[in-house]
C-alpha cells in the first residue's frame, strides 16, 4: 500500500531525485520516490562532470556509488580546433582531479538502489502524479497513479525532481523568473569497441558545432554532438543525419567508429530553455532541472543537480528532521552557489 502519510514524496527518480532521497533519508521515517520511467528506458543524455562534480558527489556521500558504476576516469583530453590539435592534461590538485561520464542507464539505477538501501525509501516506477492536494496555500499531498490504480498520499514535503518540463512546478505556482532561449541542439549515441584511449576525452570544436567522445564504461564510449540551430537551418538536414555525417567525417572519430559499432539509437533534443524557478515554497521544493536548468552544451547540469540536493539536505540537517525545517531563502542560496555556472553557460548559449 502506498497510501497514507510520508514525510517526503520525491517526484522523479533520476539524478536529482534519487540523490535527494538518499540525502534526506537520515532525517525522515518514510520517503516515497515516484518515477514515471521504466527501468529499461534509454535516456539520450550524457552525464559528465569534472573535479567540482566529484566533490559534489563526495559531499552527498555518493562518490563511491558513482565510482562503482565502472566508468573510466579521464585525466586529459585531445582538442581539435579547426585543423589544430592540442593535447591537454588536467591539473592534479588532489584525488578528485579527474573527469567522468556515466551512461544514465547505469548511473540512475545505481543512485536509486543507493537510496533504497537506506531502508526507509520506497521507489515506485512507473508512477505519475495526477494531482496535488493544496490546502490554505500549502502542498499537503498528491494523487498517485501506479499500476493503473490511483492512491492518495499525504506528505510534509513534496520534492519535485521531474525535469525542466515539470507540470507539477506549474501546479505549485513555481513559474520561471529567468529564461534564456538556446539555439543549440544536443545529440548523442553510445558506441562499443572503439580503438580510442580510455583515459582521455576528445573534443572537436568546429564552425557552430562541438563533437565530443568520452569513455563511459567497459569498452564503451559516448559520442555527443552540440549543433547550432543556424547550421541545421542552413543545411536543411535532419540533426540525426548531421550527427552521422559529422562523426563519419571527423579525422579521429570516423576511423574509430568504422572499427567499432554503435550500440544505441541517436537521441537528443533542441530548442531548450535555460530557466530558473523558485527553489521552495509552502510544503514543496524543486531540485535539479525542475528548478534550475542549464543548457547541456557546457555539461554543468549534473553538478547543478547535486548542489541543489545538497542545499536542501543541509537545511534539513540543520533542523535535525524534515518536519519543521525552514526552507525559506533557498532560492537565493542556490542562485548564488551556481551563478558562475549560469554565467558561463549563458555566455556560450548567447554566443
Where are the regions that the model predicts?
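Conserved FAD-binding catalytic core of PHBH/FMO-like flavoproteins
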Residues: 149-151, 162-259, 263-265
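FAD/FMN-dependent oxidoreductases across multiple families
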Residues: 235-327
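N-terminal FAD cofactor-binding segment of flavoenzymes
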Residues: 43-82
Amino acid at each position: 500500500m502506498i497510501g497514507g502519510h510520508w514525510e517526503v514524496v520525491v517526484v522523479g527518480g533520476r539524478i536529482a531525485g534519487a540523490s535527494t532521497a538518499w540525502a534526506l533519508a537520515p532525517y525522515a521515517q518514510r520517503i516515497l520516490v515516484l518515477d514515471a520511467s521504466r527501468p529499461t528506458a534509454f535516456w539520450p543524455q550524457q552525464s559528465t562532470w569534472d573535479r567540482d562534480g566529484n566533490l559534489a558527489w563526495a559531499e552527498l556521500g555518493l562518490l563511491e556509488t558513482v565510482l562503482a558504476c565502472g566508468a573510466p576516469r579521464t585525466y586529459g583530453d585531445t582538442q581539435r580546433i579547426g585543423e589544430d590539435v592540442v593535447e591537454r592534461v588536467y591539473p592534479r590538485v588532489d584525488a578528485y582531479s579527474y573527469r567522468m561520464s556515466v551512461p544514465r542507464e547505469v548511473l540512475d539505477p545505481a543512485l536509486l538502489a543507493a537510496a533504497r538501501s537506506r531502508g526507509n525509501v520506497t521507489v515506485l516506477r512507473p508512477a505519475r502524479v495526477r494531482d496535488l492536494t493544496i490546502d490554505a496555500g500549502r502542498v499537503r499531498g498528491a494523487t498517485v497513479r501506479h499500476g493503473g490504480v490511483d492512491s492518495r498520499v499525504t506528505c510534509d514535503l513534496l520534492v519535485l525532481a521531474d525535469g525542466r518540463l515539470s507540470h507539477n512546478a506549474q501546479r505549485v505556482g513555481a513559474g520561471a523568473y529567468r529564461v534564456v532561449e538556446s539555439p543549440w541542439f544536443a545529440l548523442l549515441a553510445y558506441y562499443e569497441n572503439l580503438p580510442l584511449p580510455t583515459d582521455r576525452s576528445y573534443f572537436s570544436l568546429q564552425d557552430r558545432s562541438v563533437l565530443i567522445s568520452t569513455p563511459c564504461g567497459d569498452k564503451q564510449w559516448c559520442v555527443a554532438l552540440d549543433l547550432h540551430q543556424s547550421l541545421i537551418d542552413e543545411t536543411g538536414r535532419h540533426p540525426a543525419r548531421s550527427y552521422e555525417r559529422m562523426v563519419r567525417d571527423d579525422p579521429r572519430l570516423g576511423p574509430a567508429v568504422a572499427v567499432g559499432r554503435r550500440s544505441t539509437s541517436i537521441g537528443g533534443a533542441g530548442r531548450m530553455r535555460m530557466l530558473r524557478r523558485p527553489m521552495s515554497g509552502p510544503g514543496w521544493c524543486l531540485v535539479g532541472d525542475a528548478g534550475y536548468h542549464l543548457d547541456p552544451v557546457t555539461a554543468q547540469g549534473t553538478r547543478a543537480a547535486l548542489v541543489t540536493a545538497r542545499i536542501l539536505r543541509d537545511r534539513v540537517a540543520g533542523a535535525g528532521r524534515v518536519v519543521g525545517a525552514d526552507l525559506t531563502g533557498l532560492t537565493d542560496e542556490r542562485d548564488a552557489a551556481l551563478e558562475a555556472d549560469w554565467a558561463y553557460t549563458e555566455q556560450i548559449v548567447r554566443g
